[in-house]
C-alpha cells in the first residue's frame, strides 16, 4: 500500500501504538453509555448523579497544555468536549494520547461530567481507548481543502465525515421516504417488491442495461421501471400497491439524471389520473409538513408553495401560452412544423408529430415551471400505457408534475384494454425497428394479465432523487445520492 508523507507519519504512530501494546483497531471495545447528543441533553441529571459515562467519536480539535489537554469528539449528531490530565489518566496513557493520536482518529473516553470555567460542558477523562487509527488526515476546511464538488462526490465518506450539513441532506432524504411510505401505508396501500432482473424491459421509454444469466443462457435487463409487474399485482386482486426501489436506465448523466436512481411507483385500483393527482398532491404536502412543519419551502431564491390546489394546465394550453402554437389545431407534423416556423421558434426538428410536441414543451415550457404544476393530456404516441381520452383519442389521460423546471412525477389512467395495448406494443415495435432504441418491447405475458381483467387503475411514478432537490435545496441530484455515477478519474 502506497502512503504519502502525511500518511507515513501517521503509520509510524500506529506502529508505536502497537509497540506499546495498544491495538489500533481492537476487536473488543468499551460499551458506549451515551451518544454525544444524549450526554448534552442529559448533562444536568448526569452531573447531579455523579454518573460515569463512556462516549465515542472522532477527534476533531485538540489542545495540549503541558500536563493537560482539551479535545472535541464528533459523532453522527454533534460534538462534545473532553478534558484529560496526566494526573487522572496516568503518565503513559497521557503521553500516548498526546504523542500518538491525530485529528480524525476514533477514540472512546470514560469519565465524569463537569463544566469548565468558560461554561463548556465536558467529560473529565479517567481512561481512553483507541478504536480506529486514521491514516489519512481529515481535510482542513479553513484552508478550503476538499471543497471541489467532484472530489466530494468521489469520496463521499470523507465528505460526510467532514461536513455535518451533508449528513443532514441525507437525513432529510430518509425522512422524505419515510413520510411517503407512512402516507401510503395509512391509506391501505401494500408495499411490495418486484424483479430487478427482467427478461423483458418495459414501463418507460429508456435504454436498458443488459446482463446475462450463465446457467439459464438467458439475456436479462436491469429494470427501467416497476410498472408492468405492479399492474400484474392489481390484476391479482390487490386494491393498492407501491414499491420504492432502484431503476436503471442507460442514459446520460446530468443535473437531473443518474443511470441508477430511486423511484416510488404507486397503483390504485378503481382510480384514475384525477384521483392520482389528489394522492400525489397530498403525499408530497404531507412529507413537507412532517419534515418542516410547513407547506412552504425555500428553494434557490424561490418560495415553493405546496399548500392549496396546485396549478393544472393541459399540454395544449401550456404550449400555446408560451409559444402561440396550438397543437390541437396542428394535428399533423407538417402543419405543426409550419406553425413553429411562423412563430419564429428555433427548435430541433423531430421525426414525428408527437415527438415534436414533446420537444416544444421541453424547450419552451418545462424550464418555466417552478411552482408545482400538473401538465395533463399528452399525445397518445408518447404514452403507450395510458388510456385515451374519450372525447379526443389523439390524447391520453396522463399528467406529469413539474417543479423547479423539471419533471418530478408521471402518472396516468392505466390502459386496461388488452387489444388496444397490443396495438400500442406493435407500434412501439415498429418504432424500435426504425431506430428508436427507447421504444418498448412486446410483453406477451403482460397482455395475458390484462386478458384476465385489470380494474380501472391510476398509476404514479415519482423520482425520489429529484424530489429531494426541493426538500434539501440542492441543484443537482449528485448531491442527494450517496454515491452518484461519475466518469473515471482522468477522463474528460
Swiss-Prot record:
Positions bound to Mg(2+) 1: 400, 407
Q: Which Pfam families match?
A: tRNA-synt_2, tRNA_anti-codon
Instruction: Provide the Gene Ontology terms for cellular component.
Output: cytosol
User: What are the alphabetically sorted keywords of the record?
Assistant: Aminoacyl-tRNA synthetase, ATP-binding, Cytoplasm, Ligase, Magnesium, Metal-binding, Nucleotide-binding, Protein biosynthesis
Q: Which GO terms describe its biological process?
A: lysyl-tRNA aminoacylation
* Needed co-factor(s): Mg(2+)
Locate the residues binding Mg(2+) 2. 407
The cellular location(s) given in this protein's UniProt record come to:
Cytoplasm
Q: Which EC class does it fall in?
A: ligase
Chief localization:
cytoplasm
Question: Where are the bilayer-spanning segments?
Answer: none
What InterPro entries does the entry give? Aa-tRNA-synt_II (IPR004364), aa-tRNA-synth_II (IPR006195), aa-tRNA-synth_II/BPL/LPL (IPR045864), Lys-tRNA-ligase_II (IPR002313), Lys-tRNA-ligase_II_N (IPR044136), Lys-tRNA-synth_II_C (IPR018149), NA-bd_OB-fold (IPR012340), NA-bd_OB_tRNA (IPR004365)
The Swiss-Prot or TrEMBL record describes its family as follows: Belongs to the class-II aminoacyl-tRNA synthetase family.
Q: What is the annotated quaternary arrangement, including any partners?
A: Homodimer.
Which HAMAP family does the entry mention?
A: Lys_tRNA_synth_class2
Name of the molecule in the record: Lysine--tRNA ligase
Native organism is: Herpetosiphon aurantiacus (strain ATCC 23779 / DSM 785 / 114-95)
Amino acid at each position: 500500500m502506497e502512503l504519502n508523507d502525511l500518511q507515513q507519519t501517521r503509520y509510524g504512530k500506529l506502529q508505536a501504538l502497537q509497540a506499546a501494546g495498544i491495538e489500533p483497531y481492537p476487536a473488543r471495545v468499551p460499551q458506549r453509555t451515551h451518544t454525544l447528543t444524549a450526554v448534552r441533553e442529559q448533562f444536568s441529571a448526569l452531573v447531579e448523579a455523579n454518573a460515569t459515562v463512556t462516549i465515542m467519536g472522532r477527534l476533531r480539535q485538540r489542545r495540549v497544555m503541558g500536563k493537560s489537554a482539551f479535545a472535541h469528539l464528533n459523532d453522527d449528531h454533534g460534538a462534545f468536549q473532553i478534558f484529560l490530565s496526566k494526573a487522572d489518566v496516568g503518565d503513559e496513557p497521557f503521553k500516548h494520547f498526546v504523542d500518538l493520536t491525530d485529528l480524525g482518529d476514533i477514540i472512546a473516553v470514560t469519565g465524569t461530567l463537569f463544566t469548565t470555567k468558560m461554561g463548556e460542558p465536558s467529560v473529565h477523562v479517567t481512561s481512553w481507548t483507541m478504536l480506529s487509527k486514521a491514516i489519512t488526515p481529515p481535510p482542513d476546511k479553513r484552508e478550503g481543502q476538499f471543497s471541489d464538488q467532484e472530489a466530494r462526490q468521489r469520496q463521499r465518506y470523507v465528505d460526510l465525515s467532514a461536513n455535518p450539513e451533508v449528513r443532514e441532506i441525507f437525513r432529510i432524504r430518509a425522512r422524505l421516504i419515510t413520510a411517503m411510505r407512512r402516507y401510503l401505508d395509512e391509506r391501505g396501500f401494500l408495499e411490495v417488491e418486484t424483479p430487478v432482473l427482467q427478461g423483458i424491459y418495459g414501463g418507460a421509454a429508456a435504454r436498458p442495461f443488459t446482463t446475462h444469466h450463465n446457467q439459464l443462457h438467458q439475456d436479462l435487463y436491469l429494470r427501467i421501471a416497476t410498472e408492468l409487474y405492479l399492474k400484474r399485482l392489481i390484476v391479482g386482486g390487490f386494491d393498492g400497491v407501491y414499491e420504492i426501489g432502484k431503476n436503471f436506465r442507460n442514459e446520460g448523466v446530468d443535473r437531473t439524471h443518474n443511470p441508477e436512481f430511486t423511484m416510488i411507483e404507486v397503483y390504485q385500483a378503481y382510480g384514475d389520473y384525477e384521483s392520482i393527482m389528489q394522492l400525489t398532491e397530498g403525499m408530497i404536502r404531507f412529507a413537507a409538513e412532517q419534515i418542516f412543519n410547513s407547506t412552504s419551502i425555500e428553494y434557490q431564491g424561490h418560495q415553493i408553495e405546496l399548500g392549496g390546489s396546485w396549478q393544472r394546465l393541459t399540454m395544449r394550453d401550456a404550449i400555446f401560452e408560451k409559444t402561440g402554437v396550438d397543437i390541437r389545431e396542428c394535428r399533423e407534423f407538417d402543419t405543426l412544423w409550419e406553425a413553429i416556423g411562423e412563430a419564429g421558434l428555433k427548435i430541433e426538428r423531430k421525426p414525428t408529430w408527437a415527438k415534436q410536441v414533446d420537444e416544444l414543451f421541453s424547450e419552451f415550457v418545462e424550464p418555466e415551471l417552478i411552482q408545482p404544476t400538473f401538465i395533463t393530456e399528452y399525445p397518445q404516441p408518447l404514452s403507450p400505457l395510458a388510456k385515451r381520452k374519450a372525447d379526443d383519442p389523439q390524447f391520453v389521460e396522463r399528467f406529469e408534475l413539474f417543479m423547479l423546471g423539471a419533471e418530478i412525477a408521471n402518472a396516468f389512467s392505466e390502459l386496461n384494454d388488452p387489444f388496444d395495448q397490443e396495438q400500442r406494443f406493435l407500434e412501439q415495435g415498429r418504432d424500435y425497428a426504425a431506430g428508436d432504441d427507447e421504444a418498448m418491447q412486446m410483453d406477451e405475458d403482460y397482455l395475458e394479465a390484462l386478458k384476465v381483467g385489470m380494474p380501472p387503475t391510476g398509476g404514479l411514478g415519482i423520482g425520489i432523487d429529484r424530489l429531494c432537490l426541493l426538500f434539501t435545496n440542492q441543484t443537482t441530484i449528485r448531491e442527494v445520492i450517496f454515491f452518484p455515477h461519475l466518469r473515471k478519474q482522468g477522463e474528460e
